[in-house]
């Protein structure tokens, strides 16, 4: 005589094995989905709260007035960032000499009304990438998006600047900077911050060793951003892949 429930008892371990296997199989996809949603929410919040330079309708004058340039938002913050960029250029980036230096933001960035310490948004149409951008390449910032290396220029544009922006070559199932090495000469890279959107074009790519600091330093007279990620893919970071981008001439105003 067969005992009741015997077949069910035999199926339970198989069901558990199936569910565990399914969870493992779906983990990268689900993680990528939720990472993308989190980044998307941060970007949406940034664009929804960034100053536009225009006043609400109820504050606009009833009589027409002559057109004027909109006021610069947070002028004291902008001046602080510009001064930092001048300082590191003039001292030759002497403190760009360790991992700890790249993790430390040169300027504590926190603006009322903005989400945490998010600085802006990096957009690369050629690889359909849009990510939050932070100052200081800490582990937390790198998990949340792309991050400017401390002791390199802050990405607001200007002569004698080179903002080095790092991103994981894939992280927790999401691509991050995985496809950055596929960029071609002439591809566009845009950095949106509270003061505008400087536009850049890819002018050079190269592979360097992790300790090649000179390759990421400011180049006198130029307005650059340099994208940096590990290379080869899934190698544990044996080398670094650089994508060097220069400000488009019509945009090079600051």
Role assignments for model-derived ranges:
Residues 1-5:
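Terminal targeting segments of Actinobacterial cell-envelope proteins
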Residues 6-196, 200-254:
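Solvent-exposed, non-transmembrane regions of membrane-associated and secreted proteins
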